[in-house]
Amino acid sequence: MTKESLEKATFAGGCFWCMVKPFDTQPGIEKVVSGYTGGHTVNPTYKEVCSGTTGHTEAIEITFDPAIFPYEKLVEVYWQQTDPTDAAGQFVDRGDSYRPVIFCHNDEQKEIAEKSKAALDASGRFKKPIVTEIAKAETFYPAEEYHQDFYKKEKAHYEGYQVASGRAAFIDANWKG
């Protein structure tokens, strides 16, 4: 992996704690950073984003090598971590700061995301329409350090939250098997 070959991908899928591990454990991923994007406040804090006044959503920014793990595969992993039929948040996390968005860094990513969304919608996997937003990537602000790699630092809390939030059951019911 050389720095020149690396690209960025940005996904919002509810609580960013739950979005890191599924990507971080894939080959070709250099790093996954939890943060905030899509809003109007410069360098927002977690408290500000949760207040709903910044316009930002919790998101992750992935640095990846597309020769090892192409963007198409990242989008596939993304869908399998979210409820793409819920635009008002994800699982127990409600509101604009938890809305699902695929933030595209270029036209190629946008085309891939749009085709993937259309295919998922046409597949009939879900009874409701796929409402995940596809938007142009904006400035990404890394979250506070205690949010980074949460699944490694706070394993029991992370695993409990996956279950208590309803995310784990939804993923099992809709994506496993």
Swiss-Prot record:
Name this protein carries in UniProt: Peptide methionine sulfoxide reductase MsrA
Organism per entry: Listeria welshimeri serovar 6b (strain ATCC 35897 / DSM 20650 / CCUG 15529 / CIP 8149 / NCTC 11857 / SLCC 5334 / V8)
Similarity remark: Belongs to the MsrA Met sulfoxide reductase family.
Active-site residues (renumbered): C15
Oxidoreductase found in the keyword field: yes
KW Hydrolase (keyword) present: no
Record-level Gene Ontology MF annotations: L-methionine:thioredoxin-disulfide S-oxidoreductase activity; peptide-methionine (S)-S-oxide reductase activity
NCBIfam families found in the cross-reference section: msrA
Reactions accelerated catalytically: L-methionyl-[protein] + [thioredoxin]-disulfide + H2O = L-methionyl-(S)-S-oxide-[protein] + [thioredoxin]-dithiol; [thioredoxin]-disulfide + L-methionine + H2O = L-methionine (S)-S-oxide + [thioredoxin]-dithiol
Coiled-coil positions: none
Pfam families cross-referenced by the UniProt entry: PMSR (PF01625)
Key words, A-Z: Oxidoreductase
Enzyme nomenclature, EC number: 1.8.4.11
One example of a Gene Ontology biological process annotation: protein modification process
Domain of life assignment: Bacteria
Record's function text: Has an important function as a repair enzyme for proteins that have been inactivated by oxidation. Catalyzes the reversible oxidation-reduction of methionine sulfoxide in proteins to methionine.
Name of the gene this protein is made from: msrA
